[in-house]
C-alpha cells in the first residue's frame, strides 16, 4: 500500500491497523536539539483518545506512546523518530458477521476491489484508529513551531448536527467533551447526542482550527501552495468531506470590495483569505474549517451486498463514535501543524536569508 507518507522535509509515515498489535509512525526530518519526551506527546494523545465520555466510542485504549528512536538524553538527534502505540482493547469478535459483507458508507467495498483482500476488524487500515499516530507526530511539530516561532495551533467545534456552537472563549474548549468554546451550550449538546445515540444513529460535525503567529512568506507556489497542502492534509482525515479556508464557500456571495483584505500601515483590515494569498502565508491567522460526515457504522438495518453480489440487510454492532467529529479537533490541529512545520523547513532552506524593506504589518486590525 502506497500513500502512507506525507511531507517533503518533515515526513511522517504511519503504519498499523485498528485491531493489530499496534499502530505507529516514523517521523523523519525533525531538526535536532528539540527537547522532547513521551509526556510531551501524551498530552496531545490524551485529548483524542477513546472512551473519555459517553458520547464517543467506549473502546478503552490508553494510547500510551513509546519513543523508540531519534531522541537521546531528552533531545531530538535529527535522525528518524519512531513512535509506537500498542493496541490493548481490540474486540474483533464484533466484526465476525461482516467479513463477507460490505458496510454501507465504509471503505470495505473499495478496499476489496483495489487489493483483493481486506481486514474486516474495525476497518483495518481505513479505521480512524490510525489518526492517533498523526496526533503523536503533530505533537512534535506543534512543540517545535511554538518554540521556534511562537506559533499557537488550536481548534474548537462549531457545529454538531443541527446545533451551532457559538464561540465565546478559548479557555472553555478544554473543559468539556465537545471541544466547545461556549460552556452554556454543553447541556444542549449532551441532550442532543443522547438522543442520537438512543436512536441507534449518528451525526456529522464541523470544527475550526487556527494557527496564530505564522510568519509571512511560507508556501511554495504553484502546486505546493500552503492552502493546497492544508486542504490535502485535512481531506486525508477519515470522514472529512469538506474544507474551507478563510471565508471558504462563503466567498461566493461576497463582492470583491468585501472579500479582498485591505492593507493599511496598521495591518490587514480583515482576513477573508484565511491567512493565505497566492499560496503563501500573509502573516495573518491561518483559519481552517472542516466538515465531518456522520459515522457510517450504526446499528440500524441497512441494505448492502456480500462478496458474491447478493443483497443483504446488515446492522453494524460494536463500539463506535455516534459523532466521530467530537474527537477530530486534536487530529485537525496535528495535521495543520505537520503542514506548517514542513513549509517552515522548506522556506528556511530556500528563502531563509531573504530580507525586504517593507515592515510586516499586523494580522488583523478589525
Swiss-Prot record:
Please give the Gene Ontology molecular function terms for this protein.
chorismate synthase activity; FMN binding
Cofactor binding mode and count: Reduced FMN (FMNH(2)).
Q: Which UniProt keywords apply?
A: Amino-acid biosynthesis, Aromatic amino acid biosynthesis, FAD, Flavoprotein, FMN, Lyase, NADP
Its domain of life reads: Bacteria
Per the record, the pathway is: Metabolic intermediate biosynthesis; chorismate biosynthesis; chorismate from D-erythrose 4-phosphate and phosphoenolpyruvate: step 7/7
What Enzyme Commission number(s) apply to this enzyme?
4.2.3.5
* Catalysed reaction equations from the record: 5-O-(1-carboxyvinyl)-3-phosphoshikimate = chorismate + phosphate
- Record InterPro entries: Chorismate_synth, Chorismate_synth_AroC_sf, Chorismate_synthase_CS
Which cofactors go with this protein?
A: FMNH2
Keyword Lyase among record annotations = yes
Q: Name one GO biological process term.
A: amino acid biosynthetic process
* NCBIfam families recorded: aroC, PRK05382.1
Return the PANTHER family for the record. CHORISMATE SYNTHASE (PTHR21085:SF0)
Q: Any idea what job this protein has?
A: This reaction introduces a second double bond into the aromatic ring system.
Q: Which family does it belong to?
A: Belongs to the chorismate synthase family.
What is this protein identified as? Answer: Chorismate synthase
The organism is Chromobacterium violaceum (strain ATCC 12472 / DSM 30191 / JCM 1249 / CCUG 213 / NBRC 12614 / NCIMB 9131 / NCTC 9757 / MK)
The uppermost taxa in this organism's lineage are:
Bacteria, Pseudomonadati, Pseudomonadota, Betaproteobacteria, Neisseriales
Encoding gene per record: aroC
